[in-house]
């Protein structure tokens, strides 16, 4: 994101729309920054927020819903409450990237994820059915 912003600012400077100034945020760490990252940990994507995500629900909610892709009830809850995920696609594509890692497995766990989402969002079975219908339409584009 910084590179995109830098390029945009430099373009504006080059056409005399902005005056050149020293960058004020060059050393600013991104939200969730962590100095030492354990890349093998599937929770590494949360950086310094990892422990908050893990403790967001109960300790039993840190067990993955799948053996193939990593997604927990705590991640689902965190994504809804702190990242404004509202649809099954939001969770399985945008927040966890599960759909890109294993589309078939994402399809298999989608009902569990939708049920947990409905519980958190206080939605009914009709909402779950609609989300699953939309997701099953989408997933066809990812399963080879």
Residue ranges and their predicted role:
Residues 1-144:
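C-terminal accessory subdomains/tails of enzymes that are appended
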């Amino acid at each position: 994101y910084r590179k995109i912003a830098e390029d945009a600012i430099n373009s504006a400077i080059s056409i005399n729309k902005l005056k050149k100034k020293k960058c004020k945020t060059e050393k600013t760490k991104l939200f969730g920054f962590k100095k030492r990252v354990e890349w093998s940990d599937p929770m590494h994507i949360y950086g310094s927020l990892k422990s908050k995500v893990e403790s967001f629900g109960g300790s039993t909610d840190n067990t993955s819903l799948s053996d193939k892709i990593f997604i927990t009830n705590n991640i689902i809850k965190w994504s809804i409450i702190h990242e404004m995920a509202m649809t099954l696609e939001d969770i399985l594509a945008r927040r966890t990237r599960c759909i890109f890692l294993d589309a078939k497995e994402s399809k298999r766990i989608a009902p569990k994820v939708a049920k947990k989402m409905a519980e958190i969002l206080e939605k009914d079975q009709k909402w779950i059915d609609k989300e699953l219908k939309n997701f099953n339409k989408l997933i066809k584009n990812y399963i080879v």
